[in-house]
């Protein structure tokens, strides 16, 4: 049995989120939350919120025991990119890409 939580359209680059997700993949949920608490990245707070949601879904919707849960899957997919004008010298302009992410965390029970 697995439980999942998804945060969609999060205004942070998927590349930056993946750095944090790589730290917690395969870990026990309590250990993962501790790692996130001491990781000095902006994405760690967002990922912690999604992980807590996945844990709550597992306990309330599927009746799983928190002591046996581990992070089975943690992915950050690319969401839509907002394009903005970035003024440059001599009247030119570049496109600034404000990237968004879809963060998915799946927790499972260890047998």
Curated annotation (Swiss-Prot):
Pfam families (alphabetical): Ribosomal_L22
CDD domains xrefs: Ribosomal_L22 (cd00336)
InterPro entries: Ribosomal_uL22 (IPR001063), Ribosomal_uL22_bac/chlpt-type (IPR005727), Ribosomal_uL22_bac/org-type (IPR047867), Ribosomal_uL22_CS (IPR018260), Ribosomal_uL22_sf (IPR036394)
UniProt-listed PROSITE patterns: RIBOSOMAL_L22 (PS00464)
GO cellular component, one term: cytosolic large ribosomal subunit
GO molecular function, one term: rRNA binding
SUPFAM superfamilies xrefs: Ribosomal protein L22
Keyword annotations: Ribonucleoprotein, Ribosomal protein, RNA-binding, rRNA-binding
Aminoacyl-tRNA synthetase is among the record's keywords: no
GO process terms (BP): translation
Record function comment: This protein binds specifically to 23S rRNA; its binding is stimulated by other ribosomal proteins, e.g. L4, L17, and L20. It is important during the early stages of 50S assembly. It makes multiple contacts with different domains of the 23S rRNA in the assembled 50S subunit and ribosome.
Known partners and oligomeric status: Part of the 50S ribosomal subunit.
Similarity remark: Belongs to the universal ribosomal protein uL22 family.
HAMAP family: Ribosomal_uL22_B
Listed name of the protein: Large ribosomal subunit protein uL22
């Amino acid at each position: 049995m697995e439980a999942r939580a998804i945060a969609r359209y999060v205004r942070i680059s998927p590349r930056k989120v993946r750095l944090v997700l790589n730290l917690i993949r395969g870990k026990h949920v309590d250990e993962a939350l501790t790692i996130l608490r001491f990781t000095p990245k902006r994405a760690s707070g967002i990922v912690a919120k999604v992980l807590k949601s996945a844990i709550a879904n597992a306990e309330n919707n599927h009746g799983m025991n928190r002591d046996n849960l581990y992070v089975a899957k943690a992915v950050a997919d690319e969401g839509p990119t907002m394009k903005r004008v970035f003024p440059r010298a001599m009247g030119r302009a570049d496109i600034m890409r404000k990237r968004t992410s879809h963060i998915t965390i799946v927790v499972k029970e260890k047998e």
